[in-house]
């Protein structure tokens, strides 16, 4: 039996304000409360690890000094690879650290690197028979990348290069469906500071991509 087969990997996907971030902890709590014998773990992307902090800081428009600090920390954790991936990620991190705008595909590379570095934790949880309930995973990369004009081919190729054999396919993906209009209305009412992925136009295109 492989490590992955010992536990279950369940992902909730959806547009901004779809309610998935509410449903994930509820699902974890219900699995625990109903004495199913399943130990459930709540997880989400972007993570709170180095590349996840870079991604979040960039899309939220954080000050350059903070971007520089988190980008340098992530760069120190890069492992050299002969396929050019580490050089590419280093270049993207340097641009972010200088406060420069990066392309959408380069931003998605940071999300992918965050996913890659987090897979060891997911594999460990699964190996111990835990159910990992994840708020966003690879489909978010595809949906929001496509919504901003990146080709599916480029996204798939880079995802394969960065994650390689570390890629984990979910046992179940649940799409929490709401319309782009409802998502935009909820976002406006929430008072939340929006990031660059949360414009009404991108939300509409992400709905189509999903």
Regions found by a protein language model. Give the residues of each.
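Conserved lysine of the Walker
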Residues: 20
